[in-house]
């Protein structure tokens, strides 16, 4: 509603941080602000007073606010949630690692968030190679141990193990 109002000519939006504010129904500024700053449909027409450096503190602001309120952050929150730039599906991970623009509407760093490619039973070789690389382990795509590792993870996840945080 806020973006539609802005399109219609409104120049001031009242909002909340993480949905906490004066009344219910107010826009979450943690979602509205990056949309206005990062999306071409808005950033060339409106001035927010928020530069790229300030915007990089958005995730920290949102999480810090939840911390002050003794709330768990919303992992699915747009832009700032832990899952906002996360994938575990093999084809998504492969494309994302080759060119993040294929699946990400903005670079996660612009809002102070991180890209996460998780290891799971849905993952392919790219997921595992990326996870191993982050730990300083280089492995070739055709290394037979990689197929063995993927097989073990898939078998274990079928019995209840979870490696998404790995």
Task: Describe the residue ranges of each PLM region.
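Short, ordered loop/turn segments at secondary-structure junctions
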Residues: 17-19, 144
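Catalytic cores of alpha/beta
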Residues: 1-10, 27, 31
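Hydrophobic residues within beta-strands of alpha/beta enzymes
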Residues: 13-14
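Short secondary-structure transition/capping segments
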Residues: 1, 24-28, 153-158
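A mid-to-C-terminal "edge-of-domain" accessory segment
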Residues: 43-166
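Alpha-helical structural signal in soluble globular domains
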Residues: 4-8, 35-39, 64, 68
């Amino acid at each position: 509603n806020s973006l539609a109002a802005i399109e219609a000519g409104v120049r001031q939006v009242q909002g909340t941080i993480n949905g906490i504010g004066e009344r219910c129904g107010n826009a979450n500024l943690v979602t509205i602000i990056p949309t206005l700053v990062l999306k071409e449909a808005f950033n060339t027409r409106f001035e927010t007073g928020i530069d790229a450096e300030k915007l990089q503190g958005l995730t920290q602001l949102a999480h810090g606010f939840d911390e002050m309120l003794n709330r768990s952050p919303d992992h699915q929150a747009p832009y700032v949630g832990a899952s906002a730039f996360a994938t575990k599906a093999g084809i998504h991970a492969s494309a994302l690692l080759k060119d993040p623009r294929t699946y990400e509407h903005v670079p996660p760093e612009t809002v102070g968030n991180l890209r996460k490619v998780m290891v799971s039973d849905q993952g392919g070789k790219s997921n595992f190679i990326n996870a191993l690389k982050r730990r300083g382990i280089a492995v070739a795509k055709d290394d037979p141990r990689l197929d063995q590792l993927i097989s073990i993870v898939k078998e274990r996840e079928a019995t209840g193990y979870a490696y998404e945080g790995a």
